[in-house]
Amino acid sequence: QTQDDKRWNIYEVNLDGTGFKPLVENDEPDLEFYDGTYLPDGRVIAISNIGYQGVPCVNGSDAVGNMVLYDPKDKSMRRLTFDQDANWNPVIMNNGRVMYTRWEYTDLTHYYSRIVMHMNPDGTENKALYGSGAMFPNSTFDVQPLPGHGSAFVGIISGHHGVARSGRMIIFDPTKGRKSTAGMVQEIPHRNRPIKEEIKDQLVNGVWPQFIKPTPLNDKYFLVAAKLDPHALWGLYLVDVYDNVTCLMQAEGEGYISPILVRKTKTPPSIPDRVKLNEKEATFFIQDIYEGEGLKGIPRGTVKSLRLHAYEYAYVKTRSDHNWHGIQSGWDIKRMLGTVPVEEDGSVIFKAPANTPISIQPLDKDGVAIQWMRSWVTGQPGEVVSCIGCHEDQNQIAIPKRVIASQKAPSALTLPEGGTRSFTFDLEVQPILDRACIACHNGEGKAFDLRGGKKDKLGYGTSYLNLHPYVHRQGGEGDMVVLQPYEYHPNTSELVRLLKKGHHNVKLTDKEWKTLYNWIDYNAPDKGYFNANVLTDLPYKGFDQIKRRKELTDKYANGAG
């Protein structure tokens, strides 16, 4: 922080302290930059507050950072990630890709969901590297590739509430497994102690030694900041896979972290850009949606289409907790994009908006979601995003077979009737109640009131508050592990069972049933908006958040605002 408005920026300085200068030069008065890393081609990846997002579980009081790609030669910049919560610590892997930590909890438990991702430097092929679909570890921070190794990396596993950034030092190898302890090769300094899965929010409270910011010297020796016991100082240590822990630097009244090795290293390969910035869409290809644990046991031919929605994330210092969008409905707005067909052999190909966090739900013939993605995929402009199936193992190779979708042009989205919009109870569900229910549920007599209009101090209508208890759903804090297919089928909801059994001769149309299923599949939300205010504190002072988010997205994300 060197500017009067106390914004963070990334600076470059020579080892002797001379030549101090900003590495990222951008004229926007409200943007901050941190966690910078050099790319092999001279460009820089950094984290920025460019999304005007706040951490939803604390009502946006903490800003969220997403990644940008910056070119010092011409000062051009492009946004790379469109993630719900924070990105941390991007670093170049030995193969030229970028790995980083992503915090996500769209319908997931928010204190077990900081996972390791990897992508190309231009943002393409962004996918999970370690920890997706598992409760352990809660968080993996400070990841660094092991020199000369094709896949292994070191990281710090930690909890969420309680001790949140330092923790246990683990060597990972994703080729051995990508969940829980499957790919954990060794804990330092406990080489002979098996690593056991422990599902606990405050994962490393009372655990010693505590480590933070490891730097590999090779695949066996590491520099790291450590605090060996509750009474020790934070110092710099040389540690190794043989359980040696040697103090290099420690001083009373000081704390040393972030050791950086000064040496000449081999530059990783430079991966050419694959984006086509003249395009507004990405192509998505699924080879066989029945592959993978997501649809395990589902008979072929069951999936008829995919329902797509985009996420609209919480704003800075804006109400966004569990009691905003609905009762146990999640943190984010779900914006309906439309549906696309699935071929008879389970293959799919379609086009959808680029630079947009998209979530997918496979639907059966009745329009019911068989599975929930509970995450998102973001295609870059002109990118072909491909996967083998539904939550398949990332170590699985493509199936050597020709599929129908690969021989066809991509399908266009079939838009929702009325166009793309946020799913809102008043617009989608209330009209069904008005037609079929309020003759009896009119606020008179014993039948509870299902009329719209009246709102309480949180903005909830009487009809929503009376109806949602009859919907069975996982809520906004669902299990990290992949759900069982049909685990939250609408038939498990008392509302649906009552209507199908027969309720005073109430009959819904096919369209109304699909709308009701959609509501249940989205976790029964109420509101489809945020009350984002103009902020009064720096660096956001004076900006209308909703307008500013759109402006920055249009300018730095290829017009995707």
Placement of each model-derived feature along the sequence:
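Short, conserved, GDST-rich strand-edge loop motifs in beta-rich repeat architectures
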Residues: Q1-W8, A46-A63, Y100-R114, F153-P174, ...
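Asp-box/WD-like beta-propeller blade repeats and closely related beta-sheet repeat scaffolds
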Residues: K6-W88
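Beta-propeller blade signature
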Residues: N9-G17, S61-D74, S113-T124, G167-R178, ...
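Multi-bladed beta-propeller domains
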Residues: L15-E32, Y70-D85, N120-S139, K176-G206, ...
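Conserved beta-propeller blade repeats
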Residues: P29-R43, Q84-M99, G133-F153, H160, ...
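Loop/turn-rich, solvent-exposed surfaces of beta-rich toroidal or solenoidal domains
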Residues: T101, P145-L238
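Surface beta-strand/loop "capping" patches
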Residues: Q202, K213, K264-S305, R421-F423
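Aromatic- and Gly/Pro-enriched helix-to-coil junctions and flexible linker segments
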Residues: T265, I298-V303, E312, P353-P357, ...
